[in-house]
Structure formats: structure tokens, C-alpha cells
């Protein structure tokens, strides 16, 4: 069996397209996090990768650092050539993210945050005790 990823049926997430959008939307993510907790399930990634009926939930973090006496700095990462997704090889990312898998524990209100903290720890060695602040939603 292949990789399992967290998905939500598109019709539930976007109320039969009445709330659908494309790109980034700065808004309160908490209603969507509740919807994810109540309506998500794990399915094989190969089955949903090209299926428009399911939205894969992929937490993504943009990381900044504001030193006490300096200007804010932003994390930028160049993807390795040997990474999993060939379309991303040698490209730059402004943040870090990844699919939510069953390893991220049970499905509840905190699953998206736990998965994001796991990803930050894996990619950047950031301790999981950090605070994350949702600033919006990205739909692609």
C-alpha cells in the first residue's frame, strides 16, 4: 500500500463551490480547521493526486526571524535534485510544508498544526514546542 494522505471531499470544503477560491486568501483558518477535523479521511495519495473531488490538506509555513536590533529575515529554501517531487527539483520555496499522514496521529482540531510542526522539525530542526499562527488559506 502506498502513502496515505489526509483529504477532505471538495464539496464539503467548498460548500458545492459557493466558497471556492484560487490562490491565497487571508482569513480566519479556524472554521476550515474544524471542517477538516470533522470531515477528513486518509486515502492513498496515488488515488487522490489527480482527483478533483478531494482536496489534499497540506500545511505550509512561511518562516521569519526578527532579530532585536535588525530587520525581519525570511527563510528561503532551494529544493534538492533528489527530492520526492521532480517538478520541484532545484526550485526555491519561500516556506516548508508537506502532506498529512497517519503518523500525525488521530484526526482532530490539532492535526494540521501537529503535521506542520513535524514538518518544521524534519526540514529545519525547529523544536515542536514553537507556536504557529495561521494567517490564511492557500488553494491550488
Predicted stretch roles:
Residues 1-34:
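Extreme N-terminus nucleophile/cap motif
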Residues 21-71, 79-84:
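Acidic, metal-coordinating catalytic segment for phosphate/diphosphate chemistry
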Residues 72-118, 122:
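Conserved Nudix-box catalytic region and its N-terminal flanking loop in Nudix hydrolases
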Amino acid at each position: 500500500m502506498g502513502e496515505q494522505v489526509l483529504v477532505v471531499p471538495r464539496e464539503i470544503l467548498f460548500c458545492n463551490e459557493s466558497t471556492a477560491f484560487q490562490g491565497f486568501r487571508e482569513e480566519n483558518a479556524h472554521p476550515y480547521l474544524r471542517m477538516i477535523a470533522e470531515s477528513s479521511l486518509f486515502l492513498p495519495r496515488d488515488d487522490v493526486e489527480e482527483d478533483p473531488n478531494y482536496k489534499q490538506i497540506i500545511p505550509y509555513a512561511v518562516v521569519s526571524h526578527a532579530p532585536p536590533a535588525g530587520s525581519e529575515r525570511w527563510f528561503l529554501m532551494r529544493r534538492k535534485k533528489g527530492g520526492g517531487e521532480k517538478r520541484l527539483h532545484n526550485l526555491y520555496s519561500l516556506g516548508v510544508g508537506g502532506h498529512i499522514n497517519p503518523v500525525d496521529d488521530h484526526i482532530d482540531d490539532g492535526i494540521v498544526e501537529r503535521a506542520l510542526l513535524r514538518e518544521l522539525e524534519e526540514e529545519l530542526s525547529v523544536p515542536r514546542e514553537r507556536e504557529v499562527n495561521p494567517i490564511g488559506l492557500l488553494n491550488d
